[in-house]
A protein has these predicted regions:
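The feature marks the mature, well-folded catalytic cores of soluble enzymes
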Residues: 2-120
Length: 121
């Protein structure tokens, strides 16, 4: 906890910022993902994994704590964790994905959010 004195001489305790990024490994099922807005060109899984590794490296470079999940490996779109929850300082709002194939992803994200201390609605 860091204490700062304001210009009026009042001290405030500010908890240190915890920067957490939740990521999910690209699942083997990625090829079957929801892609209604782009064509169905084949996905190069080697390239997808390389791009994901570079993304994780960038997050670590900016000092994010990276939590890597593999709970949704059977969900083709499980890699897109940002679609399942909006996370604020102390609260996460769980999404209700529109595509039936994505609805099962939320439970895995909810469990991880509990592990890192984020209440959710």
């Amino acid at each position: 906890m860091t204490t700062h004195a304001g210009s009026a001489g009042v001290a405030a305790s500010i908890p240190p910022l915890r920067r957490v990024a939740i990521v999910h490994e690209p699942p083997a099922a990625l090829e079957r993902g929801e892609r209604s807005f782009v064509g169905r060109d084949p996905i190069d899984m080697t390239r997808a994994r390389e791009q994901h590794a570079a993304y994780v490296a960038l997050l670590r470079d900016v000092e994010c704590e990276v939590v890597t999940l593999n709970v949704n490996a059977h969900h083709a779109d499980g890699v897109f964790v940002e679609d399942t929850a909006l996370v604020f300082d102390e609260l996460a709002v769980l999404a209700s994905p529109g595509a039936p194939s994505r609805r099962g992803e939320v439970a895995g994200i909810a469990a991880e959010l509990r592990q890192i201390g984020r209440a959710h609605v």
